[in-house]
Amino acid sequence: MAGERRDSKAAAFFCLAWALCLALPGFPQHVGGREDRADWTQEKYSHRPTILNATSILQVTSQTNVNRMWQNDLHPILIERYPGSPGSYAVRQHIKHRLQGLQAGWLVEEDTFQSHTPYGYRTFSNIISTLNPLAKRHLVVACHYDSKYFLPQLDGKVFVGATDSAVPCAMMLELARSLDRQLSFLKQSSLPPKADLSLKLIFFDGEEAFVRWSPSDSLYGSRSLAQKMASTPHPPGARNTNQIQGIDLFVLLDLIGARNPVFPVYFLNTARWFGRLEAIEQSLHDLGLLNNYSSERQYFRSNLRRYPVEDDHIPFLRRGVPILHLIPSPFPRVWHTMEDNEENLDKPTIDNISKILQVFVLEYLNLG
């Protein structure tokens, strides 16, 4: 995550975010004293999760394996991978290979484009993995897979961005792998509402600034993809709706992997979904499923509010997409340093948050 902590801009950005939150239709609209019948693009605002019981939670968490994730997915991503680098290509191929090998039958696409940077034109490639492209509505879980570009160091070290965002990438791949059976069932369902709701995983390229964070030097992948989705009819052949309107909720993971993270609420219009994360965390703790965990160091805290942070959700937020931003506050101490590496990751924390996220996704998709 490359967004600098620019306090001078925080208040102005908060006003923008607040205005957008208020503009989002959280309740059915009334005209002339009667309630208009909401179309499918409005269903996200009344969507309800299927709360998993203890038996289901135990089954879900038994399917995930942090050690396997560490070896099979995290290690291949913990390399220098700034846009256009050999490492970027290698990580992109790894992500696609892992998703294409699952039984659920993901549609895995590369969104490749060129954009001007402080170093001239560069090629970027987002990865979009869609469980059921024919579904009208999609829960989106996203992160960025690029690492920040640093000039060659005298000691030969390279920036691998372990929390930023190798770990979120690995967590998303582990989510797809461990929930493969349930997601296969969801894709095969032909009856509403399951047939109309699916999952999309997005791995953004070019989140980081090459030189200094600015509107033109940052968020290359998300800016391009949001614009593309806004101009792409959805469902296919539609005349009045597009892929942006097909996003139910945009869950963005960033800077995850350090010990004792604290996630505050950034957007009030999605606070009810943040509350589900908090409740799931408590349920897992009550069931003894969180490792090296103390309730005094709770991860998700709905009583904490923070100004929004600039990240890959911004181009989608500006187009009215509901955002759930999972980025800790404060940032990890190793942020944007060569110390953001495997040595400074905390495996129990990653395992715990991964379990919480997997339960959340199943609940949202009504796969309880």
From Swiss-Prot:
Residues 1-23 form the signal peptide. Keywords: Acyltransferase, Disulfide bond, Glycoprotein, Metal-binding, Secreted, Signal, Transferase, Zinc. One of its GO terms (molecular function) is zinc ion binding. The keyword Secreted applies. Glycans are attached at N53, N292, N352. It comes from the Eukaryota. It catalyses: N-terminal L-glutaminyl-[peptide] = N-terminal 5-oxo-L-prolyl-[peptide] + NH4(+). Disulfide bonds join C143-C169. GO terms for biological process: peptidyl-pyroglutamic acid biosynthetic process, using glutaminyl-peptide cyclotransferase. Expressed by the venom gland. Its EC number is 2.3.2.5. GO terms for cellular component: extracellular region. The active site is at E207, D254. Zn(2+) binds at D164, E208, H336. PANTHER family: GLUTAMINYL-PEPTIDE CYCLOTRANSFERASE. Responsible for the biosynthesis of pyroglutamyl peptides. Has a bias against acidic and tryptophan residues adjacent to the N-terminal glutaminyl residue and a lack of importance of chain length after the second residue. Also catalyzes N-terminal pyroglutamate formation. Belongs to the glutaminyl-peptide cyclotransferase family. This is Glutaminyl-peptide cyclotransferase. It comes from Boiga irregularis.
